[in-house]
Amino acid sequence: YGGNSKKGFDCSGFTQYIMRHHGYNLPRTAQSQGDTYSKIKSSEARKGDLVFFGSSKKNISHVGIVSSEKGSSISMIHASSSKGIMISNIENNSYWTPKIQYYARVVKD
């Protein structure tokens, strides 16, 4: 944990970096980012929202940024420890879907 440069992001370092460049200061860890923002339903998720993964709502281990338009299959951009920055489809995905705990909105209308 702790990577937050262009050469070595971890997931929450990546979300923190991207959001900072849009004027939002996120906490450092995935868990603290999830604890900070208002939860939303998956059906309300839109580009720019955060999606949190883990074994429970109190044990968040990964975060990504929704990169798909509302109404389309949900995808995220995120930092993978093994593959770097990537886009992954998380809807009906055998790896990601079971781990989704919640979505949260940082950028208000």
Q: Across the structure, where does each feature detected by a protein language model lie?
A:
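Catalytic cysteine-centered active-site loop
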Residues: Y1-K47
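Short beta->alpha junction loops/turns
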Residues: N4, S56-K57
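Short linear Ser/Thr-Pro motifs
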Residues: S5, S12, S61, S80-S81
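Aromatic- and glycine-rich peptidoglycan recognition patches
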Residues: Y24, S38-I40, V66-D109
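Structural motif
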Residues: G48-D49, I65
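Short loop/turn positions at the edges of beta-strands in beta-sheet-rich folds
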Residues: K57-K58, K70
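Short, Lys/Arg- and Gly-enriched loop/turn segments at beta-strand edges
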Residues: K58-I65
